[in-house]
Regions:
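Short alpha-helical elements
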Residues: 1-144
Length: 144
């Protein structure tokens, strides 16, 4: 049964909506966060294995869309060589149909730029985007 297309998405949706109701939230999210993570894989890879030059990782990359509670809305896994601005397009394809109440996203600064993900989200989906800058680590305090 779990091998059928869309089964895990349906299970995840049912659990997520119940949790959101328990948290006194609307079952459908109104904002989300997108991020990616590159993960090392073992020695022999398949088609979905590649090298992420920015993070210096050989393996796979996952793009995640979560709600403001951190609950998974959608995930895509592909080769680590896929650039973030291309991965977000794959992740969010038809997301406006799946999540009609989701007009706003937070993205990290890696999605900034005319040809990058933030511009594509605004132009294609009509959603607003806030770019979140990486927090700088405070300088270590000198001890005398």
């Amino acid at each position: 049964m779990a091998h059928r297309e869309g089964t895990w998405e349906q299970v995840n949706r049912a659990i997520r909506e119940r949790l959101r109701v328990r948290l006194k939230r609307d079952p459908q999210p109104s904002a989300g966060v997108v991020d990616s993570q590159s993960v090392k894989t073992t020695a022999v890879g398949g088609e979905d294995r590649g090298y992420d030059g920015g993070k210096k990782v050989k393996g796979r990359k996952r793009h995640l869309l979560v709600d403001t509670q951190g609950l998974l809305l959608k995930a895509k896994v592909h080769s680590a060589k896929v650039m973030d601005y291309e991965g977000i397009k794959t992740l969010l394809r038809r997301a406006d149909e799946t999540f009609p109440r989701l007009p706003h996203l937070w993205l990290d600064a890696g999605y900034r730029g005319e040809d990058k993900g933030a511009h594509w989200v605004e132009k294609t989906l009509g959603w607003s985007v806030d770019l979140v800058e990486r927090q700088r680590k405070p300088a270590p305090k000198e001890v005398f």
